[in-house]
Design a protein with these regions (language model features):
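Low-complexity Ser/Thr/Gly/Asn-rich repetitive segments
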Residues: 1-123
């Protein structure tokens, strides 16, 4: 497995299907790392702190596209769920014209998923 990982650039998040990363890799859990010991990793993460990717997913940076204005690279964004409401309007077919809010006593909306660790090549 280690040979397959060699092609990843230093600093690239890699989904990892195990609790323990292989030698030479760190879990991406928000921890500091020694800049002097890992200069390649420090070039990618200049603050010498890895992002905490536990329980989160990676979203492509907007970079001026207009879907997620104001975000900076490596910034964190908390979850948000809005109530859907449509007071009416014209719809073709057999519809009531109302959007309905379905509540399941959860505090977030999330897609189906499988839990992996994210790891990063240390250097």
């Amino acid at each position: 497995m280690r040979r397959e990982l060699e092609g990843y650039p230093i600093g690239s998040p890699i989904p990892w299907p195990s609790v323990t990363p292989p030698p030479g890799y760190f879990l991406m859990a928000g921890q500091r790392f020694p800049c002097g010991s890992y200069p390649g990793l420090a070039r990618v993460y200049p603050g010498c702190v890895l992002p905490d990717l536990r329980g989160t997913f990676i979203r492509g940076w907007d970079n001026g596209r207009g879907f997620d204005n104001g975000r900076t690279i490596l910034s964190y964004q908390a979850d948000q769920s809005d109530m859907i409401y449509n007071p009416g309007g014209h719809l073709q077919g057999h519809h009531s014209g109302m959007a309905h809010y379905y509540h399941t006593d959860t505090r977030e909306v999330r897609p189906k998923n499988i839990a992996f660790n994210y790891i990063v090549k240390a250097g």
